[in-house]
């Protein structure tokens, strides 16, 4: 248990961005000892500047360190240059707080926010000196744990991770600490690891893959069966009922070097019931739980004073939906302590003029770009995905933005959505072009960036049965858009690599057999697959073929209702009936040509009657919202005439074509 | 409009942060202590802070400087306004561990900027053979004498041409004029492999000469460790002095015995 710093330091002069490895953040626990503590190493399996801001890990870091008898430190995936030096010198993965070897900790706990980091998880476990396969680990090895959104289909990593936490981690982290404490005081004897994992499998929200047997008939999964009578058949996610009881992080880490989201972040609510059918985050985090406005104000003012940041982000899945967002934002801007120098950012802006009004108020200090996510180019397509933004809402929002001084607007779209036709795809170009036309009335240089991502169907959503577009088809659609926007100087098209979308598809809906593929890609050097300079499609296609797995079957095939899905034993609370009905409604909306498509929409249940998706009733909790009415200006299907959703303002219809 | 010049140190693990990182640390610290900094006008207002010479990432220093400009209304007496003598303490409390303000003084209007004023810097560092380098003379009993002879040779030469790589391009320079002084201090350990402490004053014009370039002149197989800037120098009325008049605080001594690492 001695610090590796003397061995690490001589490497630092020879690697890029050495500050990734020094720790020293304000708010960090600082160097210390693990002796007599349940020691967690919280890991983000990507590079420091991506991983440090992760709010989930920062919350757990504080909660564990507040707990007597427990200590949490942090680690991130070393960049490839650092890894090469570490492997050459036989240096293991280390924590950035005390620079202790990862193997000295009792748990290596990973946050999984994206599928393409899976090979990095294996690499970090290996760098820690721990066998990558759970079955090869003994009582001397740390437990490998994982949490985060990807764990709603844990199966691709089932062979490598000892335990998964499903859902909110705030409460269960204490229960796991207690169980590990008991294991340590029992001396971690031979066979004790299996007994501990069996105990953990009975903790609500904890999934221990080794306690479940999986059976196949041919390619099809036919059963996932608990190996013990006292282990649940279905693992239900954990949900904290009241966000106000968890005002964390209280000591947000202030890094010494530049990271993404380098600002104060205050979570204003968790969960979203807009009901966008493609959105996994919105489905698995229900219900909506708002933080009281007074607590938000307190966390913002304490946080700004403590950190010295001049920017605060009010985070959630759709921040303009927060009850009284106006008052909270005004309160921050007008706080004398902020002396006019603090800017506020709202991620995930809703698309309407009201939202832009707030945005103009909060970006007085530094006006960056505005981003909206209409997600699809036609009203028909938006009804299929249940993102009920009418044409007039979008143009109203864009008009509002350009008239208030913005010159650049960014729009996010998905392509490869269920029932999508070329007309829908090309609708993206029309929409972007129309937005430029709106902007040109205010500035000659108005521009719109259309960012297009390939759609990956996600587990636990109504689209989980849908066959993903092939990389070739996605490439063709992007080609259509490139041709359609080539001569529009005001429209910049950006797109996500369809090959990376394909690999995301393999991992997203894979079963346990995909684990061997992930391992092989890692063994052949395929780390940092989220980074285009390291992404290698061939590693994945070759590994799939080598293990006799069909990409077409895993990725591009539509599933039937009677198919046992690999994540069916993991529950986000949503009834399968609800998900299936919502999927059928999506297809029905796609078949209705005309204004009646909205009859198949699913309204936001914060402000309309409950349709019993299961997320509240199953856990005896409910929405926590300060206001029973939709936000001012009501939008996205609340209090609006959806029969006019496809109407384009006359002015645009006449003048927008190039 | 008042300008204040601040001297600060950068020691320990935090030396692995960049010049830009340090600038951000200072901006956060100024906001924490609510110092009434003047801001630039325009679309994206920034506080008026100007840093002196960049310190290479990984090097320590007990002689860093920056100038700040306060808003016009700011009072600079201890009674009703900002007590400049108390500033180093207040700022140090708001700065991360390893970066501390050690002195602050109001500077006269029209004082040249640090960038244009600083003429040379004094550095201390340890020279060691690079990993895997072939330096047979370094492991003999006469290594100190040999190194000393090489230092003398550099100092008595009229031209010292070295090659360095900048942005992937090989550049050849005569660095002799940039070396004001160069001396051996003492071995860094009992064994030659621990290296030798060196001290040099190197000029900043026409460009900042770095300790690593001096090592190339001694032997290209050497590299620098534990580099610390101990002084920056400006020229006034033909004499050399530091950018702040205030004497060194006792905590920031640069005697060799105080060169133990802060981390």
Q: Model-derived features: where do they sit?
A:
Chain B
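N-terminal, Lys/Arg- and Ser/Thr-rich interaction peptides
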Residues: 1-6
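Short beta-strand-to-loop capping motifs
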Residues: 8, 68-76, 125-131, 200-206
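N-terminal ordered "arm"
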Residues: 11-39
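A short, aromatic/hydrophobic, helix- or strand-capping loop or linear motif
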Residues: 36-44, 102-106, 161-168, 227-230
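Short, charge-patterned binding micro-sites
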Residues: 38-73
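Ordered, amphipathic secondary-structure segments that act as subunit-interaction surfaces
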Residues: 62-124
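Short amphipathic alpha-helices in soluble, non-transmembrane regions
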Residues: 78-95, 137-157, 214-215
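Core RNA-modification/binding signature centered on pseudouridine synthases
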Residues: 145-263
């Amino acid at each position: 248990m001695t610090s590796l710093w003397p061995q690490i330091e001589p490497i630092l002069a020879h690697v890029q961005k050495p500050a990734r490895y020094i720790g020293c953040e304000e708010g960090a626990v600082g160097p210390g000892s693990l002796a007599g503590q349940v020691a967690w190493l919280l890991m983000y399996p990507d590079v420091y500047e991506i991983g440090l801001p992760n709010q989930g890990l920062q919350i757990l870091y504080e909660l564990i360190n507040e707990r007597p008898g427990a200590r949490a430190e942090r680690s991130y995936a070393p960049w490839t240059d650092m890894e090469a030096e570490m492997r050459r010198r036989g240096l293991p993965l280390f924590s950035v707080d005390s620079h202790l070897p990862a193997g000295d900790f009792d748990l290596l706990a990973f946050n999984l926010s994206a599928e393409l980091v899976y090979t990095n998880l294996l690499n970090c476990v290996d760098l820690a000196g721990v066998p990558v396969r759970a079955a090869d680990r003994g009582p001397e090895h740390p437990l490998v744990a994982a949490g985060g959104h990807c764990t709603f289909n844990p199966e691709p990593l089932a062979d490598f991770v000892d335990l998964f936490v499903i859902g909110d981690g705030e409460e269960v982290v204490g229960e796991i600490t207690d169980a590990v404490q008991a294991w340590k005081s029992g001396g971690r004897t031979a066979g004790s690891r299996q007994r501990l994992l069996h105990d953990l499998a009975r903790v609500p929200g904890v999934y221990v893959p080794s306690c479940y047997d999986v059976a196949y008939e041919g390619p099809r999964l036919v059963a996932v069966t608990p190996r013990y009578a006292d282990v649940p058949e279905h693992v239900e996610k954990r949900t904290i009922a009241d966000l106000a009881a968890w005002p964390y992080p209280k000591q947000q880490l202030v890094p010494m070097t530049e990271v993404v989201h380098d600002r104060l972040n205050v979570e204003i609510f968790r969960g979203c019931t807009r009901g966008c059918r493609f959105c996994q985050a919105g489905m698995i985090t229900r219900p909506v739980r708002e933080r009281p406005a007074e607590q938000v104000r307190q966390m913002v003012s304490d946080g700004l004073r403590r950190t010295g940041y001049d920017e605060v982000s009010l985070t959630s899945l759709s921040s303009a939906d927060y009850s009284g967002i106006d008052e909270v934002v005004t309160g921050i801007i007008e706080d004398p302590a902020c002396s006019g120098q603090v800017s506020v950012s709202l991620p995930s802006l809703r698309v309407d003029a009201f939202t832009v009004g707030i945005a103009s108020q909060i970006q007085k200090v530094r006006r960056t770009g505005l981003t909206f996510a209409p997600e699809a180019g036609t009203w028909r397509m938006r009804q299929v995905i249940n993102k009920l933004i009418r044409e007039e809402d979008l143009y109203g929002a864009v008009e509002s933005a350009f008239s208030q001084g913005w010159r650049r607007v960014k729009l996010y779209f998905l392509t490869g959505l269920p029932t999508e036709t070329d007309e829908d795809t090309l609708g993206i170009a029309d929409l972007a072009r129309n937005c430029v036309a709106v902007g040109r009335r205010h500035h000659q240089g108005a521009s719109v960036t259309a960012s297009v991502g390939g759609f990956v169907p996600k587990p636990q959503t109504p689209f989980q049965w849908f066959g993903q577009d092939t990389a070739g088809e996605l490439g063709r659609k992007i080609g259509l858009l490139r041709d359609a926007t080539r001569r529009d100087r005001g429209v910049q098209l950006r797109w996500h690599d369809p090959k990376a979308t394909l690999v995301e598809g393999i991992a997203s809906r894979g079963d346990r057999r995909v684990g061997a593929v992930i391992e092989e890609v890692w063994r052949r050097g395929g780390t940092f697959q989220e980074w285009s300079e390291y992404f290698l499609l061939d590693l994945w296609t070759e590994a799939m073929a080598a293990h006799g797995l069909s990409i077409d079957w895993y990725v591009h095939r539509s599933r039937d209702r009677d198919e046992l899905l690999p994540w069916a034993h993991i529950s986000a609370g949503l009834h399968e009936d609800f998900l299936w009905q919502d999927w059928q409604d999506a297809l029905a909306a796609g078949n209705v040509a005309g204004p009646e498509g909205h009859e198949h929409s699913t309204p936001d249940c914060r402000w309309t009657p409950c349709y019993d998706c299961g997320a509240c009733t199953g856990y005896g909790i409910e929405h926590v919202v300060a206001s029973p009415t939709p936000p001012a200006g009501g939008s996205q299907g609340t209090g609006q005439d959806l029969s006019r959703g496809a109407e384009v303002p006359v002015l645009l219809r006449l003048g927008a074509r190039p | 409009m008042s300008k204040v010049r601040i001297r600060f140190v950068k020691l320990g693990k935090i030396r692995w942060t960049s010049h830009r990182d340090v600038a951000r640390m200072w901006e956060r610290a100024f906001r924490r202590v609510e110092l009434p900094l003047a801001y630039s006008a325009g679309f994206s207002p920034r506080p008026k802070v100007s840093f002196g010479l960049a310190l290479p990432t990984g090097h320590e220093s007990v002689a860093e400087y920056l100038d700040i400009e306060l808003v016009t209304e700011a009072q600079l007496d201890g009674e009703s306004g900002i007590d400049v003598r108390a500033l180093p303490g207040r700022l140090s409390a708001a700065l991360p561990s390893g970066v501390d303000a050690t002195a602050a003084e109001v500077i006269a209007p029209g004082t040249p900027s640090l960038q244009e004023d600083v003429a040379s810097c004094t550095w201390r560092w340890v020279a060691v053979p690079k990993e895997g380098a072939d330096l047979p003379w370094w492991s003999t009993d006469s290594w100190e004498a040999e190194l000393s002879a090489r230092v003398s040779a550099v100092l008595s030469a009229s031209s010292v041409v070295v090659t360095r790589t900048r942005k992937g391009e090989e550049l050849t320079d005569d660095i002799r004029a940039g070396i004001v002084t160069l001396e051996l201090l003492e071995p860094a350990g009992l064994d030659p492999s621990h290296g030798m402490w060196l001290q040099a004053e190197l000029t900043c014009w026409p460009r900042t000469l770095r300790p690593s370039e001096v090592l190339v002149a001694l032997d290209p197989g050497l590299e620098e460790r534990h580099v610390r800037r101990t002084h920056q120098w400006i020229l006034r009325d033909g004499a050399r002095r530091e950018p702040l008049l205030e004497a060194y605080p006792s905590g920031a001594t640069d005697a060799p015995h105080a060169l133990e690492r802060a981390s």
